[in-house]
């Protein structure tokens, strides 16, 4: 079967292909395997490659035509490494140290119901910050998300960091349930689009759940290269949109 020409579907991970921080279901895996025979598929996640593998499976780089970890700062095409970028070179160690020191002091003084561990996670192309700590349980994760919606813990912290470190040229993106990402301006999910040749891909569909202003899907969902973006609420929602696009008679 020939693929739909000049077309690719790009997917967020959390809330789009999987439930937040859950693994992909066998049903969704089978659905995507069938879809892959019809149209090219790509994944763009904010997490590092190991976390994406935890959710989508160890072999995921071979199951999509493109896989973009850390917004595309680590990129794979047809299972092979395509390109990498490094935030350490961009910011320099002194700026990174000042930024992380401030973040840790801020979280230490933050009064929230519970704290766990791994408040700062340094990745290849970004810094991930979690006020509650990334090694909280799934139940604690869900409780923090509700608390954050009411008390604006993450948005408040982001606004303070923006003001304090405005000279560094950083961008902040709230994604998932418990954390937010920090990266140089332009290193959001739109970064991955530079790896998709414009003369080949005339139609790009994007599927994501955090397409609101400040969400980590917002920039790519509104990029002029995206033909149409679909705001989804669950993997089932994603599957329904795809069925309408590619299986409707």
From Swiss-Prot:
Principal location: cytoplasm
Active site residues per record: 12, 14
Binding locations of alpha-D-mannose 1-phosphate: 21, 123, 134, 141, 179, 181
Superkingdom in the source lineage: Eukaryota
Annotated binding of Mg(2+) 1, by residue: 12, 14, 209
Enzyme Commission number: 5.4.2.8
Keyword Cytoplasm: yes
Gene3D superfamilies: 3.30.1240.20, HAD superfamily/HAD-like
Compartments where located: Cytoplasm
GO molecular function: metal ion binding; phosphomannomutase activity
Xref: SUPFAM superfamilies: HAD-like
Catalytic activity: alpha-D-mannose 1-phosphate = D-mannose 6-phosphate
Residues that, per the record, bind Mg(2+) 2: 223, 227
InterPro entries per record: HAD-like_sf, HAD-SF_hydro_IIB, HAD_sf, PMM, PMM_cap
One Pfam family named in its UniProt record: PMM
GO cellular component, one term: cytosol
UniProt keywords, alphabetically: Cytoplasm, Isomerase, Magnesium, Metal-binding
GO terms under biological process: GDP-mannose biosynthetic process; mannose metabolic process; protein N-linked glycosylation
Pathway annotation: Nucleotide-sugar biosynthesis; GDP-alpha-D-mannose biosynthesis; alpha-D-mannose 1-phosphate from D-fructose 6-phosphate: step 2/2
Keyword Signal assigned: no
Quaternary structure annotation from Swiss-Prot or TrEMBL: Homodimer.
Function: Involved in the synthesis of the GDP-mannose and dolichol-phosphate-mannose required for a number of critical mannosyl transfer reactions.
Family indicated by similarity: Belongs to the eukaryotic PMM family.
UniProt name for this protein: Phosphomannomutase 1
The gene coding this protein: pmmA
